[in-house]
Amino acid sequence: MSTDTALVIGLGNPGPQYEKTRHNVGFMVAGTLAGRMGGKFNVHKKSGAEIVEGRLAGRRVILGKPRSYMNLSGGAVAGLARFFSVDAANIIVVHDELDLDFGTIRLKLGGGEGGHNGLRSISSSLTTKDYLRTRVGIGRPPGRMDPADYVLKPFSSTERKELDLVCEEAADAVELLLELGLEAAQNRLH
């Protein structure tokens, strides 16, 4: 990755009722990264997001959490990108991924949204799918449960025991992306 400012976005839904749900793992990883940056989230009025400004892996980083619901998060992401003059190549979105087993972390550039409405909103608002993604596996729903219901459920007690470690590993993956770029970070992580 370049030495330009990076925009790292954790996806989730606002409000205490969503705080511990699978869909909010992006917010959880953003919290881990904010701790590493030594900062606290503050409202950025022009974008509709909460942000922390600081450094990670030797890079200037704007860490953001949209304050809108997941399916409307693109407006906040595009607003931050415009305000801080960050192009899509320097945006990393951290999000939950149904198609990966719980705790599996994968990095990718662009591609489809896989039914993820937060990614769809971001791609639409940025008018490109070519931004980096840190995908955090939450697993598939059991039986015939609707995936839309599953992502809004809390993690199981077994998963909760491992969640802090998963968030640390996802934060490590973001730092690898910032430091090494996609290919080298993928080689280390995958």
From Swiss-Prot:
The record marks 13 as: Discriminates between blocked and unblocked aminoacyl-tRNA. Its EC number is 3.1.1.29. Hydrolyzes ribosome-free peptidyl-tRNAs (with 1 or more amino acids incorporated), which drop off the ribosome during protein synthesis, or as a result of ribosome stalling. The active site is at 23 (proton acceptor). It is found in: Cytoplasm. Monomer. Signal peptide: none annotated. InterPro entries: Pept_tRNA_hydro, Pept_tRNA_hydro_CS, Pept_tRNA_hydro_sf. GO terms for biological process: protein quality control for misfolded or incompletely synthesized proteins; rescue of stalled ribosome. One of its GO terms (cellular component) is cytoplasm. Belongs to the PTH family. It comes from Rhodococcus erythropolis (strain PR4 / NBRC 100887). CDD domains: PTH. GO terms for molecular function: peptidyl-tRNA hydrolase activity; tRNA binding. It comes from the Bacteria. Gene3D superfamilies: Peptidyl-tRNA hydrolase (3.40.50.1470). Keywords: Cytoplasm, Hydrolase, RNA-binding, tRNA-binding. The record marks 96 as: Stabilizes the basic form of H active site to accept a proton. Pfam families: Pept_tRNA_hydro. It catalyses: an N-acyl-L-alpha-aminoacyl-tRNA + H2O = an N-acyl-L-amino acid + a tRNA + H(+). This is Peptidyl-tRNA hydrolase. TRNA binds at residues 18, 69, 71, 117.
